[in-house]
Swiss-Prot record:
It comes from the Archaea. One of its GO terms (biological process) is proton motive force-driven plasma membrane ATP synthesis. It comes from Methanocaldococcus jannaschii (strain ATCC 43067 / DSM 2661 / JAL-1 / JCM 10045 / NBRC 100440). This is A-type ATP synthase subunit B. Coiled coil: none annotated. It holds the Pfam family ATP-synt_VA_C. PANTHER family: V-TYPE PROTON ATPASE SUBUNIT B (PTHR43389:SF4).
Length: 465
Protein backbone atom coordinates (compact mmCIF):
# COMPACT_ATOMS: atom_id res chain seq x y z
CA UNK A 1 0.00 0.00 0.00
CA UNK A 2 1.32 3.48 -0.84
CA UNK A 3 2.12 5.78 2.04
CA UNK A 4 0.67 9.25 2.43
CA UNK A 5 3.84 10.66 0.93
CA UNK A 6 3.40 8.67 -2.28
CA UNK A 7 0.30 10.65 -3.21
CA UNK A 8 2.23 13.91 -3.22
CA UNK A 9 5.00 15.29 -5.41
CA UNK A 10 7.33 17.55 -3.44
CA UNK A 11 9.24 20.56 -4.74
CA UNK A 12 10.62 21.42 -1.31
CA UNK A 13 14.26 20.40 -1.81
CA UNK A 14 16.05 22.17 1.03
CA UNK A 15 19.64 21.42 0.05
CA UNK A 16 21.89 19.25 -2.10
CA UNK A 17 25.01 17.64 -0.59
CA UNK A 18 27.04 15.43 -2.90
CA UNK A 19 24.73 12.60 -4.04
CA UNK A 20 22.09 13.50 -1.43
CA UNK A 21 18.91 15.56 -1.57
CA UNK A 22 17.40 16.84 1.66
CA UNK A 23 13.64 17.26 1.19
CA UNK A 24 11.58 19.05 3.84
CA UNK A 25 7.90 19.00 4.67
CA UNK A 26 7.61 15.28 3.87
CA UNK A 27 5.02 13.12 5.64
CA UNK A 28 4.94 9.34 5.72
CA UNK A 29 8.26 8.66 3.98
CA UNK A 30 9.86 5.34 4.91
CA UNK A 31 13.46 4.17 5.13
CA UNK A 32 14.50 2.38 1.93
CA UNK A 33 11.59 3.80 -0.06
CA UNK A 34 12.23 4.37 -3.76
CA UNK A 35 11.69 7.91 -5.03
CA UNK A 36 11.51 9.48 -8.48
CA UNK A 37 13.52 12.67 -8.92
CA UNK A 38 12.32 14.97 -11.73
CA UNK A 39 15.14 17.24 -12.96
CA UNK A 40 14.60 20.86 -14.14
CA UNK A 41 14.92 19.66 -17.77
CA UNK A 42 12.31 16.93 -17.25
CA UNK A 43 14.80 14.04 -16.96
CA UNK A 44 13.77 11.43 -14.40
CA UNK A 45 16.22 9.84 -11.99
CA UNK A 46 15.74 7.24 -9.29
CA UNK A 47 16.69 7.54 -5.66
CA UNK A 48 16.23 5.91 -2.28
CA UNK A 49 15.32 7.28 1.15
CA UNK A 50 18.27 6.88 3.51
CA UNK A 51 16.73 8.69 6.45
CA UNK A 52 13.27 10.02 7.35
CA UNK A 53 12.63 12.08 10.50
CA UNK A 54 10.69 15.14 11.68
CA UNK A 55 9.36 16.03 8.24
CA UNK A 56 12.77 15.69 6.56
CA UNK A 57 13.77 12.98 4.08
CA UNK A 58 17.37 12.33 3.00
CA UNK A 59 17.37 10.89 -0.52
CA UNK A 60 20.35 9.28 -2.26
CA UNK A 61 20.08 9.84 -6.03
CA UNK A 62 21.30 6.78 -7.97
CA UNK A 63 22.51 8.75 -11.00
CA UNK A 64 24.05 11.59 -8.96
CA UNK A 65 22.86 15.15 -8.40
CA UNK A 66 24.68 16.90 -11.27
CA UNK A 67 22.33 19.40 -12.92
CA UNK A 68 19.85 19.49 -10.04
CA UNK A 69 18.87 22.66 -8.20
CA UNK A 70 16.91 23.34 -5.03
CA UNK A 71 14.38 25.50 -6.91
CA UNK A 72 13.27 23.42 -9.88
CA UNK A 73 13.78 19.82 -8.73
CA UNK A 74 10.72 17.77 -7.81
CA UNK A 75 10.67 14.55 -5.80
CA UNK A 76 7.91 11.94 -5.90
CA UNK A 77 7.77 9.22 -3.24
CA UNK A 78 6.58 5.90 -4.68
CA UNK A 79 5.74 4.00 -1.49
CA UNK A 80 7.77 1.02 -2.78
CA UNK A 81 11.03 -0.48 -1.62
CA UNK A 82 13.73 -1.52 -4.09
CA UNK A 83 12.67 -4.67 -5.96
CA UNK A 84 13.99 -6.70 -8.86
CA UNK A 85 12.09 -8.84 -11.33
CA UNK A 86 13.45 -12.39 -11.34
CA UNK A 87 13.20 -15.19 -13.87
CA UNK A 88 15.09 -18.28 -15.04
CA UNK A 89 15.82 -16.23 -18.17
CA UNK A 90 18.45 -14.39 -16.13
CA UNK A 91 20.82 -17.36 -16.41
CA UNK A 92 23.38 -16.64 -19.11
CA UNK A 93 22.85 -12.86 -18.93
CA UNK A 94 25.02 -9.90 -17.85
CA UNK A 95 23.50 -6.95 -15.94
CA UNK A 96 24.74 -3.69 -14.51
CA UNK A 97 24.83 -3.11 -10.76
CA UNK A 98 21.19 -1.99 -10.74
CA UNK A 99 19.95 -5.13 -12.52
CA UNK A 100 19.57 -3.71 -16.06
CA UNK A 101 20.80 -5.90 -18.98
CA UNK A 102 24.07 -4.65 -20.55
CA UNK A 103 24.79 -7.60 -22.86
CA UNK A 104 22.67 -6.39 -25.77
CA UNK A 105 19.96 -8.96 -25.06
CA UNK A 106 16.25 -8.30 -24.51
CA UNK A 107 14.74 -7.08 -21.27
CA UNK A 108 13.92 -9.84 -18.80
CA UNK A 109 10.25 -10.79 -18.53
CA UNK A 110 9.98 -11.29 -14.76
CA UNK A 111 8.22 -14.25 -13.25
CA UNK A 112 7.81 -12.22 -10.05
CA UNK A 113 9.27 -9.22 -8.23
CA UNK A 114 11.24 -9.65 -5.01
CA UNK A 115 12.46 -7.15 -2.42
CA UNK A 116 16.25 -6.88 -2.75
CA UNK A 117 16.68 -6.78 1.03
CA UNK A 118 15.45 -10.36 1.27
CA UNK A 119 13.59 -11.81 4.18
CA UNK A 120 15.18 -12.66 7.53
CA UNK A 121 15.64 -16.37 8.17
CA UNK A 122 14.54 -17.77 11.49
CA UNK A 123 17.70 -19.36 12.97
CA UNK A 124 15.66 -22.43 13.88
CA UNK A 125 14.83 -22.96 10.19
CA UNK A 126 18.50 -23.11 9.19
CA UNK A 127 20.33 -26.37 8.53
CA UNK A 128 24.03 -26.88 9.19
CA UNK A 129 26.05 -26.32 5.98
CA UNK A 130 27.40 -29.59 4.62
CA UNK A 131 28.28 -31.44 1.40
CA UNK A 132 31.31 -30.66 -0.70
CA UNK A 133 31.53 -28.02 -3.45
CA UNK A 134 34.43 -28.69 -5.81
CA UNK A 135 36.21 -25.57 -7.08
CA UNK A 136 39.01 -27.38 -8.89
CA UNK A 137 41.54 -25.41 -6.78
CA UNK A 138 43.64 -27.81 -4.66
CA UNK A 139 44.38 -25.35 -1.85
CA UNK A 140 40.63 -24.82 -1.38
CA UNK A 141 39.24 -28.29 -2.08
CA UNK A 142 41.96 -30.15 -0.21
CA UNK A 143 43.05 -27.88 2.61
CA UNK A 144 40.12 -25.46 3.11
CA UNK A 145 37.12 -27.39 1.87
CA UNK A 146 34.09 -25.33 0.84
CA UNK A 147 30.67 -26.76 1.73
CA UNK A 148 27.16 -25.92 0.57
CA UNK A 149 25.62 -23.11 2.58
CA UNK A 150 28.96 -21.77 3.83
CA UNK A 151 30.31 -18.22 3.57
CA UNK A 152 34.07 -18.38 2.97
CA UNK A 153 35.81 -15.10 2.08
CA UNK A 154 39.05 -14.62 0.16
CA UNK A 155 41.40 -12.05 1.72
CA UNK A 156 43.59 -10.56 -0.98
CA UNK A 157 45.78 -7.50 -1.47
CA UNK A 158 46.22 -4.84 -4.11
CA UNK A 159 47.92 -6.30 -7.18
CA UNK A 160 47.29 -9.94 -6.27
CA UNK A 161 45.42 -12.14 -8.78
CA UNK A 162 42.09 -12.36 -6.96
CA UNK A 163 40.17 -11.48 -10.13
CA UNK A 164 41.73 -14.40 -12.00
CA UNK A 165 41.00 -16.69 -9.05
CA UNK A 166 37.39 -15.48 -8.85
CA UNK A 167 36.89 -16.13 -12.57
CA UNK A 168 38.48 -19.58 -12.29
CA UNK A 169 36.25 -20.58 -9.37
CA UNK A 170 33.18 -19.29 -11.23
CA UNK A 171 34.14 -21.39 -14.28
CA UNK A 172 35.09 -24.58 -12.48
CA UNK A 173 32.84 -24.83 -9.41
CA UNK A 174 30.50 -27.80 -9.32
CA UNK A 175 28.55 -30.00 -6.92
CA UNK A 176 29.01 -33.76 -7.00
CA UNK A 177 26.04 -36.04 -7.32
CA UNK A 178 23.54 -37.09 -9.93
CA UNK A 179 20.79 -34.67 -10.92
CA UNK A 180 22.07 -31.77 -8.80
CA UNK A 181 21.32 -28.35 -10.36
CA UNK A 182 24.08 -25.77 -9.95
CA UNK A 183 24.38 -22.06 -10.80
CA UNK A 184 26.80 -19.21 -10.15
CA UNK A 185 25.75 -15.64 -9.32
CA UNK A 186 28.70 -13.31 -9.84
CA UNK A 187 28.61 -9.70 -8.60
CA UNK A 188 31.50 -7.29 -9.20
CA UNK A 189 31.47 -3.94 -7.38
CA UNK A 190 33.52 -0.85 -8.12
CA UNK A 191 35.69 -2.49 -10.76
CA UNK A 192 37.37 -0.76 -13.71
CA UNK A 193 36.20 -1.13 -17.31
CA UNK A 194 39.29 -3.24 -18.01
CA UNK A 195 38.39 -5.63 -15.19
CA UNK A 196 34.77 -5.75 -16.38
CA UNK A 197 35.90 -6.68 -19.90
CA UNK A 198 38.14 -9.40 -18.42
CA UNK A 199 35.26 -10.99 -16.51
CA UNK A 200 32.78 -10.79 -19.40
CA UNK A 201 35.31 -12.26 -21.84
CA UNK A 202 36.24 -15.05 -19.41
CA UNK A 203 32.61 -16.06 -18.94
CA UNK A 204 31.79 -15.92 -22.64
CA UNK A 205 34.79 -17.73 -24.09
CA UNK A 206 34.66 -20.61 -21.59
CA UNK A 207 30.92 -21.19 -21.81
CA UNK A 208 30.56 -20.62 -18.06
CA UNK A 209 28.04 -17.85 -18.74
CA UNK A 210 25.33 -20.41 -19.57
CA UNK A 211 24.87 -21.32 -15.89
CA UNK A 212 25.72 -17.89 -14.45
CA UNK A 213 24.02 -14.58 -13.68
CA UNK A 214 26.54 -11.72 -13.79
CA UNK A 215 26.17 -8.25 -12.24
CA UNK A 216 28.83 -5.59 -12.92
CA UNK A 217 29.03 -2.26 -11.10
CA UNK A 218 31.80 -0.03 -12.46
CA UNK A 219 34.05 2.28 -10.46
CA UNK A 220 32.43 5.36 -12.00
CA UNK A 221 28.89 4.19 -11.25
CA UNK A 222 27.08 5.86 -8.32
CA UNK A 223 28.01 4.74 -4.81
CA UNK A 224 24.40 3.87 -3.97
CA UNK A 225 24.33 1.40 -6.87
CA UNK A 226 27.34 -0.31 -5.28
CA UNK A 227 25.28 -0.71 -2.11
CA UNK A 228 22.42 -2.29 -4.08
CA UNK A 229 24.49 -4.67 -6.26
CA UNK A 230 25.22 -7.46 -3.72
CA UNK A 231 21.63 -7.34 -2.49
CA UNK A 232 20.25 -7.66 -6.01
CA UNK A 233 22.64 -10.57 -6.68
CA UNK A 234 21.62 -12.35 -3.48
CA UNK A 235 17.92 -11.85 -4.23
CA UNK A 236 18.42 -13.63 -7.56
CA UNK A 237 20.39 -16.35 -5.74
CA UNK A 238 17.55 -16.84 -3.23
CA UNK A 239 15.08 -17.17 -6.07
CA UNK A 240 17.20 -19.81 -7.83
CA UNK A 241 17.94 -21.69 -4.60
CA UNK A 242 14.68 -21.65 -2.69
CA UNK A 243 12.19 -21.57 -5.56
CA UNK A 244 14.05 -23.46 -8.30
CA UNK A 245 15.93 -25.97 -6.08
CA UNK A 246 19.38 -25.02 -7.35
CA UNK A 247 22.68 -25.02 -5.48
CA UNK A 248 23.95 -21.47 -5.97
CA UNK A 249 27.48 -20.18 -5.49
CA UNK A 250 27.55 -16.39 -5.02
CA UNK A 251 30.89 -14.66 -5.67
CA UNK A 252 31.08 -11.04 -4.47
CA UNK A 253 34.09 -8.93 -5.46
CA UNK A 254 35.37 -6.52 -4.21
CA UNK A 255 33.74 -6.05 -0.79
CA UNK A 256 36.34 -3.38 0.01
CA UNK A 257 34.83 -1.22 -2.74
CA UNK A 258 31.41 -1.86 -1.22
CA UNK A 259 32.61 -0.68 2.20
CA UNK A 260 34.22 2.41 0.67
CA UNK A 261 30.83 3.29 -0.85
CA UNK A 262 29.27 2.78 2.57
CA UNK A 263 31.82 5.19 4.05
CA UNK A 264 31.22 7.74 1.28
CA UNK A 265 27.48 7.78 1.88
CA UNK A 266 27.97 7.93 5.65
CA UNK A 267 30.27 10.95 5.28
CA UNK A 268 27.76 12.70 3.00
CA UNK A 269 25.15 12.27 5.74
CA UNK A 270 27.54 13.78 8.32
CA UNK A 271 27.34 10.67 10.49
CA UNK A 272 29.78 10.19 13.36
CA UNK A 273 32.53 7.94 11.94
CA UNK A 274 33.72 4.73 13.56
CA UNK A 275 37.04 2.92 13.11
CA UNK A 276 39.14 4.51 10.33
CA UNK A 277 36.21 6.59 9.17
CA UNK A 278 33.88 3.69 8.42
CA UNK A 279 30.34 3.93 9.83
CA UNK A 280 29.74 2.32 13.19
CA UNK A 281 27.02 0.13 11.68
CA UNK A 282 29.32 -1.47 9.08
CA UNK A 283 29.34 -4.79 10.99
CA UNK A 284 25.54 -4.93 10.91
CA UNK A 285 25.45 -3.89 7.27
CA UNK A 286 27.92 -6.60 6.23
CA UNK A 287 25.94 -9.14 8.23
CA UNK A 288 22.81 -8.35 6.18
CA UNK A 289 24.79 -9.57 3.15
CA UNK A 290 26.81 -12.48 4.52
CA UNK A 291 23.97 -13.96 6.57
CA UNK A 292 21.92 -14.54 3.41
CA UNK A 293 24.04 -17.62 2.74
CA UNK A 294 22.92 -20.96 4.10
CA UNK A 295 20.62 -23.96 3.91
CA UNK A 296 16.96 -23.92 4.92
CA UNK A 297 14.96 -26.83 6.31
CA UNK A 298 12.47 -28.14 3.80
CA UNK A 299 14.26 -26.56 0.83
CA UNK A 300 16.51 -28.43 -1.58
CA UNK A 301 18.54 -25.46 -2.80
CA UNK A 302 21.46 -23.85 -0.99
CA UNK A 303 23.33 -20.54 -1.16
CA UNK A 304 27.10 -20.53 -0.71
CA UNK A 305 29.07 -17.30 -0.63
CA UNK A 306 32.66 -16.44 -1.56
CA UNK A 307 33.11 -12.73 -0.79
CA UNK A 308 36.45 -11.38 -2.04
CA UNK A 309 38.07 -8.34 -0.47
CA UNK A 310 41.39 -6.54 -0.83
CA UNK A 311 43.00 -5.73 2.51
CA UNK A 312 44.28 -2.12 2.53
CA UNK A 313 48.08 -2.23 3.03
CA UNK A 314 47.75 -6.04 3.38
CA UNK A 315 46.49 -5.40 6.93
CA UNK A 316 44.35 -8.31 8.11
CA UNK A 317 43.39 -6.27 11.21
CA UNK A 318 41.81 -3.54 9.04
CA UNK A 319 38.08 -3.10 9.89
CA UNK A 320 36.86 -4.66 6.62
CA UNK A 321 38.63 -8.06 6.90
CA UNK A 322 38.34 -7.92 10.69
CA UNK A 323 34.55 -7.55 10.71
CA UNK A 324 34.17 -9.95 7.78
CA UNK A 325 36.06 -12.58 9.76
CA UNK A 326 33.64 -12.26 12.68
CA UNK A 327 30.62 -12.96 10.47
CA UNK A 328 31.95 -15.56 8.04
CA UNK A 329 33.20 -19.12 8.54
CA UNK A 330 36.91 -18.89 7.83
CA UNK A 331 39.08 -17.19 5.24
CA UNK A 332 41.31 -17.97 2.25
CA UNK A 333 44.41 -15.74 2.47
CA UNK A 334 46.41 -14.81 -0.63
CA UNK A 335 50.15 -14.32 -0.05
CA UNK A 336 52.28 -11.60 -1.61
CA UNK A 337 55.39 -13.72 -0.93
CA UNK A 338 54.03 -16.65 -2.96
CA UNK A 339 52.94 -14.22 -5.69
CA UNK A 340 56.50 -12.87 -5.90
CA UNK A 341 57.71 -16.44 -6.43
CA UNK A 342 55.43 -16.66 -9.46
CA UNK A 343 53.07 -19.14 -7.81
CA UNK A 344 49.41 -19.03 -8.85
CA UNK A 345 47.06 -19.11 -7.02
CA UNK A 346 49.15 -17.63 -4.19
CA UNK A 347 47.05 -19.17 -1.40
CA UNK A 348 48.86 -19.35 1.94
CA UNK A 349 47.29 -22.39 3.57
CA UNK A 350 48.67 -21.76 7.07
CA UNK A 351 46.63 -18.62 7.95
CA UNK A 352 43.76 -19.85 5.77
CA UNK A 353 40.90 -21.71 7.41
CA UNK A 354 37.55 -23.21 6.55
CA UNK A 355 35.72 -23.70 9.85
CA UNK A 356 33.16 -26.02 8.26
CA UNK A 357 35.63 -28.07 6.20
CA UNK A 358 34.97 -31.19 8.25
CA UNK A 359 31.31 -31.15 7.20
CA UNK A 360 32.32 -31.70 3.57
CA UNK A 361 35.13 -34.23 4.01
CA UNK A 362 35.15 -37.99 4.36
CA UNK A 363 33.41 -41.05 2.90
CA UNK A 364 30.41 -40.26 0.70
CA UNK A 365 31.50 -36.63 0.34
CA UNK A 366 35.13 -36.64 -0.78
CA UNK A 367 37.25 -39.63 0.28
CA UNK A 368 37.94 -41.55 3.48
CA UNK A 369 41.55 -40.34 3.77
CA UNK A 370 40.78 -36.64 3.31
CA UNK A 371 40.88 -35.38 6.91
CA UNK A 372 43.92 -37.40 7.94
CA UNK A 373 46.09 -36.68 4.90
CA UNK A 374 45.31 -32.95 5.09
CA UNK A 375 46.22 -32.83 8.80
CA UNK A 376 49.53 -34.51 7.99
CA UNK A 377 50.22 -32.14 5.10
CA UNK A 378 49.48 -29.09 7.26
CA UNK A 379 51.90 -30.27 9.95
CA UNK A 380 54.63 -31.11 7.42
CA UNK A 381 54.33 -27.79 5.58
CA UNK A 382 54.40 -25.81 8.84
CA UNK A 383 57.54 -27.72 9.88
CA UNK A 384 59.19 -27.05 6.52
CA UNK A 385 58.33 -23.34 6.67
CA UNK A 386 59.85 -22.99 10.15
CA UNK A 387 63.02 -24.75 8.96
CA UNK A 388 63.47 -22.11 6.24
CA UNK A 389 63.95 -19.54 8.99
CA UNK A 390 66.52 -21.81 10.63
CA UNK A 391 68.41 -22.27 7.35
CA UNK A 392 68.66 -18.51 6.97
CA UNK A 393 70.58 -18.44 10.27
CA UNK A 394 72.71 -21.62 10.36
CA UNK A 395 72.77 -22.73 6.73
CA UNK A 396 71.43 -25.94 5.17
CA UNK A 397 74.59 -27.89 6.04
CA UNK A 398 73.58 -27.87 9.72
CA UNK A 399 70.30 -29.70 9.00
CA UNK A 400 69.68 -33.39 9.62
CA UNK A 401 68.37 -35.69 6.89
CA UNK A 402 64.94 -35.48 8.51
CA UNK A 403 65.04 -31.68 8.39
CA UNK A 404 66.10 -31.72 4.74
CA UNK A 405 63.13 -33.95 3.92
CA UNK A 406 60.72 -31.46 5.51
CA UNK A 407 62.43 -28.56 3.74
CA UNK A 408 62.06 -30.37 0.43
CA UNK A 409 58.41 -31.12 1.21
CA UNK A 410 57.66 -27.42 1.78
CA UNK A 411 59.30 -26.46 -1.53
CA UNK A 412 57.55 -29.22 -3.49
CA UNK A 413 54.23 -28.47 -1.77
CA UNK A 414 54.32 -24.89 -3.04
CA UNK A 415 55.61 -25.79 -6.49
CA UNK A 416 53.35 -28.78 -7.24
CA UNK A 417 50.33 -28.53 -4.95
CA UNK A 418 49.73 -24.80 -4.45
CA UNK A 419 50.84 -23.89 -7.98
CA UNK A 420 48.14 -24.55 -10.54
CA UNK A 421 47.40 -23.48 -14.09
CA UNK A 422 44.75 -20.80 -14.54
CA UNK A 423 42.72 -23.31 -16.56
CA UNK A 424 43.67 -26.38 -14.52
CA UNK A 425 40.62 -28.02 -12.98
CA UNK A 426 41.69 -30.72 -10.49
CA UNK A 427 39.23 -33.24 -9.12
CA UNK A 428 39.30 -33.91 -5.39
CA UNK A 429 40.79 -37.34 -6.11
CA UNK A 430 43.66 -35.74 -8.05
CA UNK A 431 44.20 -33.27 -5.21
CA UNK A 432 44.37 -35.98 -2.53
CA UNK A 433 46.59 -38.24 -4.66
CA UNK A 434 48.96 -35.31 -5.15
CA UNK A 435 49.17 -34.83 -1.38
CA UNK A 436 50.11 -38.49 -0.95
CA UNK A 437 52.84 -38.18 -3.58
CA UNK A 438 54.29 -35.20 -1.73
CA UNK A 439 54.08 -36.93 1.66
CA UNK A 440 56.13 -39.77 0.16
CA UNK A 441 59.09 -37.34 0.34
CA UNK A 442 59.04 -37.81 4.13
CA UNK A 443 60.18 -40.97 5.93
CA UNK A 444 57.20 -43.21 6.52
CA UNK A 445 57.68 -43.10 10.29
CA UNK A 446 57.00 -39.34 10.16
CA UNK A 447 53.41 -39.89 8.97
CA UNK A 448 52.08 -40.08 12.53
CA UNK A 449 48.76 -38.36 11.83
CA UNK A 450 47.58 -40.93 9.28
CA UNK A 451 46.21 -44.37 10.13
CA UNK A 452 48.30 -47.34 9.01
CA UNK A 453 45.52 -48.80 6.84
CA UNK A 454 45.23 -45.50 4.93
CA UNK A 455 48.98 -45.42 4.34
CA UNK A 456 48.89 -48.96 2.94
CA UNK A 457 45.95 -48.07 0.70
CA UNK A 458 46.98 -44.67 -0.68
CA UNK A 459 50.75 -44.19 -0.18
CA UNK A 460 52.54 -44.38 -3.57
CA UNK A 461 54.96 -46.96 -2.15
CA UNK A 462 52.11 -49.45 -1.67
CA UNK A 463 49.90 -48.44 -4.60
CA UNK A 464 52.62 -49.40 -7.06
CA UNK A 465 52.73 -52.97 -5.79
Amino acid sequence: MATAASAIEYSSVKSIAGPLLIVEGVEGAAYGEIVEVICPDGEKRMGQVLEAREGLAVVQVFEGTTGLSTKDTRVRFTGRTAKIGVSMEMLGRIFNGAGKPIDGGPEIVPEKELDINGYPLNPVSRKVPSDFIQTGISTIDGMNTLVRGQKLPIFSGSGLPHNQLAAQIARQAKVRGEGEKFAVVFAAMGITSEEANFFMEEFRKTGALERAVVFINLADDPAIERILTPRIALTVAEYLAYEKDMHVLVILTDMTNYCEALREISAARNEVPGRRGYPGYMYTDLATIYERAGRVKGRTGTITQIPILTMPDDDITHPIPDLTGYITEGQIVLSRELHRKGIYPPVDVLPSLSRLAGNGQGPGKTREDHKKVVNQAYAAYAEGRSLRDLVAVVGEEALTDRDRAYLKFADEFEDKFVRQGKDEDRSIEETLDLLWELLAILPEEELKRVDRELIEKYHPKYRKK
